[in-house]
Amino acid sequence: MKKYLATLVILLVSSFATVSAQTWGNPYSGNVKSASQQQASITFKNKSDYTMTLKIMKEYGGVYSTVVLSPRSSRTVSFSSTSSYKLKIKAVHNGIASYHDGGNFSVTCNEYEWTEGTMEFMLSTYGSGLGPRISAKEFESNY
């Protein structure tokens, strides 16, 4: 009986080790990640003296994530599936806010490819640089 239990334990341990070692991606390109690591990511960088709030909106409405960036800071957001998003930006400096349409972007995340990128934001006192202006009401809307 002890020999049977020891064999069963060894088989169970071996099967768990095999599952955790599975990889995804193209092994010929060198872009191979384990299943537990597979996520797309975008790093948002604020290269200005403004505090920025980024609302990442889902393609058909609803907030995916809200990111607050202090002046000259960055933050990485992870995505677990392929989708399209809309970006809304609120920039605040000396208590004065401006609101902007940051445009649309897409993220790819599947077993063969995934997005890893950077978006940088710069706002100067001489011009926008963040996209067309929108109203505060439009920024607050979740559509």
Sequence positions of predicted segments:
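Sec-dependent N-terminal signal peptides
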Residues: Y4-F16
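Primarily secretory-pathway and cell-envelope proteins
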Residues: A21-Y60, S65, K90-Y143
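Mature, secreted membrane-active peptide modules
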Residues: F44, S80-T82
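Short beta-strand segments within Ig-like beta-sandwich modules, predominantly Fibronectin type-III
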Residues: S65-P71
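Tight coil/turn sites that cap or link beta-strands
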Residues: P71-R72, T82
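Short strand-edge motifs at loop-to-beta-strand transitions and within beta-strands
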Residues: S73-V77
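A short tyrosine-centered beta-strand micro-motif
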Residues: S84-L87
